[in-house]
Amino acid sequence: MPRSFLVKSKKAHTYHQPRAQGDELVWPPAVIPVAKEHSQSASPLLSTPLPSQTLDWNTIKQEREMLLNQSLPKMASAPEGPLVTPQPQDGESPLSESPPFYKPSFSWDTLASSYSHSYTQTPSTMQSAFLERSVRLYGSPLVPSTESPLDFRLRYSPGMDTYHCVKCNKVFSTPHGLEVHVRRSHSGTRPFACDVCGKTFGHAVSLEQHTHVHSQERSFECRMCGKAFKRSSTLSTHLLIHSDTRPYPCQFCGKRFHQKSDMKKHTYIHTGEKPHKCQVCGKAFSQSSNLITHSRKHTGFKPFSCELCTKGFQRKVDLRRHRESQHNLK
């Protein structure tokens, strides 16, 4: 068998073949000279010298610069669009350095936003639409809000079925409860107004309870003193007087109150805070009831009338004094 055939067989197979007697190992193998034009287009990895040769880094650097200079004109003439890596030509290595990646003509942000939108949607589209409608209702039509609308979908927990207020972190089990809470506590919007006195409320149930004030019906009677009330909540507050329960103390003077709202109103005396301001004359009050009574001076509304002489009054205390002084009634 010719010697040249044995040498080619060793290059073609990776497994071990027994050498014939007389064969000699030659290291390093003879390097076949390559033409100059072909060597310039070759990859630096293919032109790297073998262990027995001298490692010339300057030559490798020049070959890399030559490859970059040849590829840059191709990139300049390429049309806009996604970059497609060309197939390696004969004599080039796929591991050779490629030109720097350029920005495509389309935006990755639009693609990412479309995918993120599909993952951030709430499980129920009806609940999400209900929350969006609730956010639009929170803005006051009279006083424009300077803050951005609250996005409650960011605090929705699909596994727990709860709704968190982004202002005070209070938790609700239904979106309707969250809507009522934000309308009452944070937005200042009171869409339900009384037809008799003009007082506004944040919920329809509160307005319905308020209408009993203008009627003469007193269906809630105290069993201890016999005093009757139009609302059950007023009776519950009255019962605290008989038990002398005052669980809410003032942090400034120590005075105790039956209700937390009464204690909060009392603290305005120490702080001088007057959060309720008249939109007509600008006068401020510490209690909302005083603002309502003051507003009747501008409108001329007199909700309390005497049943004997039909004279009207803006305050209930004025009607009581009139009955006592003019009609001798108590």
Curated annotation (Swiss-Prot):
Q: Which Gene Ontology cellular-component terms appear in the entry?
A: nucleus
Write down the superkingdom of origin.
Eukaryota
An example of a GO molecular function for this protein is: zinc ion binding
Q: What conditions trigger expression of this protein? A: Down-regulated by IL6 treatment in myelomonocytic cells, and in response to EPO in myeloid cells; EPO-induced down-regulation of Gfi1b is STAT5-dependent.
Residue ranges covered by zinc fingers (C2H2-type): 163-186, 192-214, 220-242, 248-270, 276-298, 304-327
Stored Gene3D superfamilies:
Classic Zinc Finger
Q: Where does the protein end up? A: Nucleus
- Supply one GO BP term: regulation of erythrocyte differentiation
Q: Interaction with ARIH2: where is this region?
A: 91-330
Where in this protein does the record say N6,N6-dimethyllysine is found?
A: K8
Region Disordered, residue ranges: 1-21, 75-99
**Transcription recorded as keyword:** yes
**The protein's role, per its UniProt record:** Essential proto-oncogenic transcriptional regulator necessary for development and differentiation of erythroid and megakaryocytic lineages. Component of a RCOR-GFI-KDM1A-HDAC complex that suppresses, via histone deacetylase (HDAC) recruitment, a number of genes implicated in multilineage blood cell development and controls hematopoietic differentiation. Transcriptional repressor or activator depending on both promoter and cell type context; represses promoter activity of SOCS1 and SOCS3 and thus, may regulate cytokine signaling pathways.
Q: Quote the record's domain comment.
A: The zinc finger domain is essential for erythroid expansion and acts as an activation domain whereas non finger domain serves as repression domain.
Q: How does it assemble?
A: Interacts with histone methyltransferases EHMT2 and SUV39H1. Interacts with ARIH2 (via RING-type 2) and with RUNX1T1. Forms a complex with GATA1. Component of a RCOR-GFI-KDM1A-HDAC complex. Interacts directly with RCOR1, KDM1A and HDAC2.
> Under what name is this protein listed?
Zinc finger protein Gfi-1b
Organism field: Mus musculus
Q: What is the lineage of its organism?
A: Eukaryota, Metazoa, Chordata, Craniata, Vertebrata
